[in-house]
UniProtKB/Swiss-Prot annotation:
SMART domains: RRM (SM00360)
Annotated ranges, domain HTH OST-type: 863-937, 991-1067, 1087-1161, 1163-1238, 1247-1321, 1323-1398, 1399-1472, 1474-1548
Compartments reported by the entry: Peroxisome
Protein's recorded name: Meiosis regulator and mRNA stability factor 1
Gene Ontology biological process terms from the UniProt entry: meiotic cell cycle; oogenesis; regulation of gene expression
Domain of life: Eukaryota
Organism the protein comes from: Xenopus tropicalis
Span of domain NYN: 340-477
Polar residues: compositionally biased ranges: 638-647, 659-690, 1637-1648
Amino acid sequence: MEGNETANLCSKSVGWLQKQDKDVEPWLWKLSNCFSTLTQSLPSAGGNPKDYMEHPKPKVELKDVPPPPPPVKPCKNIFPTVPLPKIQPPALPAVQHQTGPKVSCCVLCSNSTSCAPEIRCSGGGYIHPNTILDTGTVTCQVAPGLSFAPESPFKKASSTSTFVPRSAGFSNLCLENRLSPCQCHSQPAPCYSKVHLNPFHGDHPRFQVPALGTSPSYFTSGLSQHVENHLAQSEYLSHYCTSSLHFNTPSSAFLKGPHFCNVCFEKPSSSKVTDSHKIWPNIPPPNTSSAPIPICNGCGTQETVKEAALILAKNLCKASQKYGSPDLATGQMQENLPPIGVFWDIENCSVPSGRSAVTVVKRIRERLFKGHREAEFICVCDISKENKEVIEELNNCQVTVAHINATAKNAADDKLRQSLRRFADTHTSPATVVLVSTDVNFALELSDLRHRHSFHIILIHKNQASEALLHHAHELIHFEEFISDLPPRLPIKMQQCQTLLYVYNLPTNRDAKSISNRLRRLSDNCGGKVMSISGTSAILRFANQESAERAQKRMENEDVFGNRITVSFTPRNKEVNETKNSCVSNEKAKSPKKVNKNTKLCLSIKDDSSSNTKAASKSACGSVSKNSNVKSLKELCQMQSKSNKTSQQEKDKKRNGDKQGTLSQSSPLCTNQMLQTARNVGTDNTASKSFQKRDDTTRKSNADSQKEQKNKEDVVFQISNPSAFSKLTESRQASPFCSSQSGWSSRSLSPSLSNCSSPIATNQTGAADNSVDPFANGADIQIGNLDYRMSRKELQQTLHDIFSRHGKIKNVELSPHTDYQLKATVQMENLQEAICAVNSLHRYKIGSKRIQVSLATGATNKSLSLLSFGTVSILQDAPACCLPLFKFTEIYEKKFGHKLIVSDLYRLTDTVTIRDQGNGRLVCLLPSVQARQSPMGSSQSHDGSSANCSPVVFEELEYHEPICRRHCSNRKFSGHDFDPDSYIIPFVIISLKTFAPQVHSLLQTHEGTVPLLSFPDCYAAEFSALKEVQEGQGGVPLEHLITCIPGVNIAFAQNGIKVVKWIHNKPPPPNSDPWLLRSKSPVGNPQLIQFSREVIDLLKNQPSCIMPVTKFIPTYHHHFAKQCRVSDYGYSKLLELLEAVPHVLQILGMGSKRLLTLTHRAQVKRFTQDLLKLLKSQASKQVIVREFSQAYHWCFSRDWNVTEYGVCDLVDIVSEIPDTTICVSQQDGESVISIPKRERTPEEVERTKQFSKEVVDLLRHQPHFRMPFNKFIPSYHHHFGRQCKLTYYGFTKLLDLFEAIPDVLQVLECGEEKILALTEMERIKALASQLVKLLRSQKDSSINMPDLLTEYSKTFGYSLRLHDYDVSSVPALMQKLCHVVKIMDTDLGKQIQLINRKSLRSLTAQLLILLMSWDESSSLTVEQLCQVYQSVHGIPLNPCEYGFVSLAELLKSLPYLVEVHTNDLCEDSVQLTSLYVFAKNVRSLLHTYHYQQIFLHEFPNAYSKYVGEVLQPKQYGYSSLEEILGAIPQVVWIKGHGHKRIVVLKNDMKVCHQMDKELLCLTSPMDLLCGPVPSCLPSPQLHPDPVVTQPADLIQFEEHFHFSDLVYPEETQYNPLCNGTQPCNFPTSADLDTFSEPSTQNICPQESKSTKELPESPVKRQHRNRVKLAANFSFAPVTKL
């Protein structure tokens, strides 16, 4: 396409069509290739060609023109006629006809002659002839059009004149009626939409031919035969313009070749619809030279060598854009391309941390989407778990992000599989599916897509993908290689500069609040905040320059209470301008590592007037661009309009420069790059380079920015965040009292910089601004007492809904869901709306609780700022920046003179943290605050390692000698030649008791510092050589042993040398706490806390707790079965992560041979836990030191090695444990380690029993009836509304209290975490209670067994885990719950139903009588009670029938009746409570009285005589006799009034059998012979029984009683024990020993007489028996004497 050019444009042959350039797409042609000659003539339809030419002119050949379709509805005239200037055309030579007919366009386009008619399109535009346009290189694009039905007949149109009659909206083509019947060539026509050919003559009718498929054209009737015979439908093509901006613009007709839009003169778009061979038939080249074809003046000039570039007028382009529509060719192309869908399991193949998801999506589209159209791009994840930045990037890339619940199993896989199936249902083959996952679960879907749907499968997978998944893909791409070189996610965000706007001419007759509200309404749309109002002026603050400019336009000359205000960027007072006009960053204080990256300079230029500010800001928006080679018409139009715009800006700038000698720019110019300015001192002119923001739409154009010469101006530099002093600036900006601290200025800023602009002054200004209106940025509303049983999402949505009714909400935040203390903060934009919401929604019910709503006032924030400052000042001076809470409270109140509210400390989340440690709470300063408060940005030795997060901290020592020159044995040592990898860590054996004072003495002689490299030499010179051994031979690393000494630490000097020194650079006080003298343990985030626990668990399983650094990653992977991803913790290197946990991990040595070990603090804590476990495993809770190794082996199943805990002697580490934890004493000359014990009082024991019930109640509300150990105290406080005081139960440690209730609670250890869980029995009871609640809510109180787990999860919010109950199936679990539910077989399958419980009241009476009748002083075991019950009642006692899993649990449910104890043999024994022992005596006493009743006033004396002791109701917890008798309603009741009140024995407790052993064995001191006859004795039998057939003893004396001979009356409705008749002969304990399971066959109850004759109530009068018998008689009717 770049051949030699000739004088004529169309002088080339057709042969170039067969040789396409590989580098150029087949649909892109240059204009010069659009014309050629045809020397081969084709025969006409009639066989003999007819010459219709009157004079030699170029001829147009027609070939294979198909019949046109029916005419369509004409379009309206859209574009107006745009006349172009008339230019006289040059003289055109006559074209000679040679061998064959030649193709030519019309020579002139004259509207004045009849032979040159006007060819108009549906747009109605006129193209005047003789118009010469500029030339240039124009890239034309050609695309084929649409085919039409070949059966459509030609439509004739009458032609009575040389002009074509048409209606608006049709494209007309006028052809001469004397055309030669030759073929029309198939080359493109010129780039001009109105092709003018020779004029028509009126003697032939015209045919209508479609041009664009929408507008018909006309041909003469002389072409009818030729068209019908020689135009093939396959070769007829419709070409049209594909520009979406010119869709409605019609184009002229064509015969073979491209068609062009009459607006932009461009060829159709570059989108290829069909094959190029179909567009351009393979026509042989002509064998004769073609005549030059002149082009009409609309397309170019004759005899030009360069190609014509036709640029339309700018207004015509804009008109076409207004009425633009989607591109037809592009749309058709997209529909014809095969679809492609991407399905991304982002949880399986995640974006690497810190990397850009945009790049991943871009790579997928660039590499896989060629030749396809995007039909689906979806990724599935839990958006609450995924990185928010990744989700935002995916949304910005138009990727569908489907949210699923991460807790549901395979939720993401199910969603993706559903999407794949939907894609297959929507699209057909050919289609492509891209799956980004490694999960084998997609194998089935991929198999169906490939083999059943014939889709092309591309799998992007990780290295560990299964073969079953890989087998179904056509193409495999490794995900690791695909994302190997991803760029980091470093979003360059423009730092916003707060710009001030000054408002003048405000009214003075209105209050400031009204004016502020009016100004806020005017500027609110632009983000303006009213900072202050003074007199007739006000100051408004905006986030950036653009918002301020928009606000200036809107507010200028606005009415404010009758005054027309003026707005300006510059204040009328120049001094105020210098103070206010500074760029203050809105970003939060960043870490010291990131501050330097975000450093910016703000350029402020003084100005006197506000009019020049606007012009200067406009001129800074961009620079003038040079026009280079333009390659498209679109870019030509853009460049033309851009050049016009820039030229106009230059004119304005020049005009402003003439009037005024300086440029003004009041607001700081903030860009995302550092502004580079050059200042020439002593010269008048200052040259500076202007920066222009990159425009995405003009990236393809090569525009060189020009330099501008500016007039003389004053430039003031203001440093908002100077890079060298970033830490200082941030710390002072974060402190509310930075204005009062100026002692650090000598270290922070150089004099020149500090004099230019002070960051402190900027911060003071901001503080003063904030004090004007504390609610300028909105009002915060605190919401408490939220229902923690609701989900976070539901709570957040509910809060948003109810608060949005009262105003606009900025944000709704929920605090972490811990300890039931769920709180929320709602930020509203308007203070009045916030107050209204607080008044309306306080105590509003959400869920099951009423929320507490309060407004976070500015006074509260101020008080918190004061508290924060005071807290920082105290903790900075504390050792390790930590203090116990009580000590901190004492110091704070003494220092500041007012009481400290501890709850306010918990609100300082960005300053301090409060941890539970041991038996108290610890207040610690956060590492970020410590780094900000350090004057040099690096931590002090006593401050620990907050800067580099290492236990070996970087000291402020600038340089230190690597060795001690006085004692080092290697005199030739050179620090430059020293190789750290050659350093070998010495292992020594020495006791800390000996080593510690020697190290302090060594530091004293070396002025407080000793280099670690020469420490052994210095120690040997002062004392004796250390005993060094090889690793693993019982030694401890010397470096670790030194850090075990209180007050001594190892620090890094600036030159990287480790130095042994004192922590406070002086010897520690003699009585100081050793723990406060150790290196600090910084407080980390929850991720680091978890990582520190993993490090402890990992290292304690290593030999001597030592591991090389190089083996950490593989060991971690092997131990935890997961990768240690450093980026998850916010670090880029492993060493940085290891240094971030200095309180548990110590890095020993230098170079590549460094070792990892646990710190001494972590070792002591670990040994304490192991020692307590060992002591508790001993029966005596103590161990002799001499037998310690043996006891250790029995407890932990491993040999004792003291070096496992980082010391060389047991005494060294035992002495570190507090005396409150263990006790070391001397017994018989032996050292004994024991747990200190204290005897608890009975009150404390009772409280502990009550505490056990509270623990059960609390854990029943927890998922799976368990909770973390560290959550118990706050949960207890929240649940019961009171503190859990350990001293109330007689303990000092919570764990000891838990160990005192082992029957209900067990403490599980999961690594370093402790979990509280109910015992198995309590879990079953709790689950039974839940099942009762669940079944009662179901229909018919039953549920199908398969639905149990689902309904349980829906009801209680968590799943039912069968393994918690040691079962693997639901039926097995139901067997353990047989006392609550039963399984029934129904028509619908197996159902779970509630059992019908028996009445516990009757059983209680039976058990009470059995226990009261037990005649021995020893307690009765539960098993014996079961045997007695079965022997007396004849049926076994089944506690499940009463809803209890065991009889012991049933008895425990009667705590007011009986007490259940566990003896040494682990047997449960039962006995009556002290109150019911009294009831037993009362029952026995009343049995001695007639009618079993006694007067109340006689009861005390009778009881004292019967029992032998005086009755004292207070001994039982009652104040009077009536109260204690009323406390045993099951035994007695009081009837009557006044002095006639009588104590009556209940019928259930009466003795109704003559064989009453109690009467025979009474031990009462009273003489029974002198007393009344007992009413229970029957009268003598006056009427003998019938004659018996067998001889028998009529009197029925029996010497031995057997249980089978007992007689029981019939049962009544109330009492199954026969209407109060109770057996009174019970077996003794000796009988129970020989008693086997009784047989019910031996029990033969006799029939009794009618119960009507028996005494039922003491009220009913009965006759006395005058005969007293001491024998047992059979039942007989009672007769009167």
